[in-house]
């Protein structure tokens, strides 16, 4: 469990996030925030941070509370989950956790069909490519936002344009990097009092290469504030260190539903057979407008809609963001199961008055039509008019069981005696009696 249970909202308790959170490097929080602080300082003062100021910011970020880092990582994972195609989310979790061989994980493209860019901080002025974010988040490699050209996809990657699998992404090492690595290695060898023999030509293999420290210092200036040892150490530290969520992949596979009710005791995540509380969608901070559609592209469910609810993770993977029930499934529902005596009347009723309602595939349907519909005492979502339900009154088929709690509503809607008086009907009037004028 988290050391501070109230620090996370219901959005950070998704199994996708809980499974990946222990694999996020704590260095990612420090790195993204450090780059943002440097850009903000430059815009405000029109000059770069001094080494002392940058080092102070680095120490401040490294000493941040674990709850803050975990909350930031959870929000970023929720944003990444939204940008990963639903059919690839499960494979992504299994690959990162080591339960499955890594395969291509496709992301949703931008309007030009290329890799999307997202912001990694709130109110950030910088956007990062998704593959860059994945490398920094799960490998702890200090890359700049302009280092997208240095990323190289593996030969086994079948979709190099949109794949964000961290195991398929590498960093191209240039000659300059190798040259600098030589001096770093020699410096570490001198500090450990164990000089090494450098790599030279065939005639100079037996001769040690001496390190000209003066020439190195005159040619290169270190711009960062991380030392080599410190950089390697912090880049390997996970964001969850001993206080992570009480979650395992076996628990995820054994329980497919989850409860996002923040009012539970101690914020402990329960796993009932159904879920009732609504979940709020994150707004992705990308350069392009986010157009959220289901894989079919035909339906979209409003977050303010009464049918919005937390759904099964596996169903979310198979059905996408909003997966409406097929017509055959609606026909099998208790509301569309006519009794023998009502079949003729119902067939004519449902043919012309069948309610058109988009229903989530994750909403549990009871096998008994007499089951009561339980709603929370307080509304989960604000009572606003939804554009997806233009009619305020919905007619239901008149074959509901008398014990159904909707009986009063149905009888009120279907009883002609209780209908609102409409315009007066035109009745045939008595024929006028014609009286001859000549009588």
From Swiss-Prot:
Residues 265-348, 415-439 are annotated as: Disordered. It comes from Mus musculus. Binds DNA as a homodimer. The gene is Nfic. Residues 1-195 bind DNA. The modification Asymmetric dimethylarginine is found at residues 365, 395. The 9aaTAD motif is a transactivation domain present in a large number of yeast and animal transcription factors. Residues 299-312 have a biased composition (Low complexity). GO terms for molecular function: DNA-binding transcription activator activity, RNA polymerase II-specific; DNA-binding transcription factor activity; RNA polymerase II cis-regulatory region sequence-specific DNA binding. It is found in: Nucleus. The modification Phosphoserine is found at residues 194, 294, 302, 305, 323, 333, 337, 339, 343. The modification N-acetylmethionine is found at residue 1. One of its GO terms (cellular component) is fibrillar center. The modification Omega-N-methylarginine is found at residue 365. InterPro entries: CTF/NFI, CTF/NFI_DNA-bd-dom, CTF/NFI_DNA-bd_CS, CTF/NFI_DNA-bd_N, MAD_homology1_Dwarfin-type. The keyword DNA-binding applies. This is Nuclear factor 1 C-type. Its main location: nucleus. Transmembrane segments: none annotated. The keyword Transmembrane does not apply. Keywords: Acetylation, Activator, DNA replication, DNA-binding, Methylation, Nucleus, Phosphoprotein, Transcription, Transcription regulation. Belongs to the CTF/NF-I family. The modification Phosphotyrosine is found at residue 300. A motif (9aaTAD) lies at residues 404-412.
């Amino acid at each position: 469990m988290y050391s501070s249970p109230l620090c996370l909202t219901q959005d950070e308790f998704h199994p996708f996030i809980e499974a990946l959170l222990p694999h996020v490097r704590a260095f990612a929080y420090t790195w993204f925030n450090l780059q943002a602080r440097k850009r903000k300082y430059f815009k405000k003062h029109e000059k770069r941070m001094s080494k002392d100021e940058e080092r102070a910011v680095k120490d401040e970020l490294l000493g941040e509370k674990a709850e803050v880092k975990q909350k930031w990582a959870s929000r970023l994972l929720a944003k990444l989950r939204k940008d990963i195609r639903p059919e690839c989310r499960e494979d992504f979790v299994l690959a990162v956790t080591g339960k499955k061989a890594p395969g291509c994980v496709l992301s949703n493209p931008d309007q030009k069909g290329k890799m999307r860019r997202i912001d990694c901080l709130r109110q950030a002025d910088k956007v990062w490519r998704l593959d860059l974010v994945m490398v920094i988040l799960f490998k702890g490699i200090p890359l700049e936002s302009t280092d997208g050209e240095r990323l190289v996809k593996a030969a086994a990657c079948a979709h190099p344009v949109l794949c964000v699998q961290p195991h398929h992404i590498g960093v191209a090492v240039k000659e300059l990097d190798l040259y600098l690595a030589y001096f770093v290695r020699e410096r570490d060898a001198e500090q450990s009092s164990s000089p090494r023999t450098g790599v030279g030509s065939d005639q100079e293999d037996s001769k040690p290469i001496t390190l000209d420290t003066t020439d190195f210092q005159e040619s290169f200036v270190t711009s960062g504030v991380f030392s080599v040892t410190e950089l390697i150490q912090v880049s390997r530290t996970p964001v969850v260190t001993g206080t992570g969520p009480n979650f395992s992949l076996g628990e995820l596979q054994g329980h497919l539903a989850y409860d996002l009710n923040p009012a539970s005791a101690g914020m402990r995540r329960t796993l009932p057979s159904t879920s009732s509380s609504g979940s709020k969608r994150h707004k992705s901070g990308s350069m392009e407008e986010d157009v959220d559609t289901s894989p079919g592209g035909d339906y979209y469910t409003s977050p303010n809609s009464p049918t919005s609810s937390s759904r099964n993770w596996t169903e979310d993977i198979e059905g996408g963001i909003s997966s409406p029930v097929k017509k055959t499934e609606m026909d099998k529902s208790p509301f569309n199961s006519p009794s023998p005596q009502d079949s003729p009347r119902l067939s004519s009723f449902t043919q012309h008055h069948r309610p058109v309602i988009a229903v989530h595939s994750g909403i549990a349907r009871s096998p008994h039509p007499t089951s009561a519909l339980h709603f929370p005492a307080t509304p989960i979502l604000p009572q606003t008019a939804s554009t997806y339900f233009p009619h305020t009154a919905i007619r239901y088929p008149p074959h509901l069981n008398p014990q159904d709690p909707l009986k009063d509503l149905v009888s009120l809607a279907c009883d002609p005696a209780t209908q609102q008086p409409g315009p007066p009907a035109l009745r045939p009037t008595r024929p006028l009696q014609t009286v001859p004028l000549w009588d």
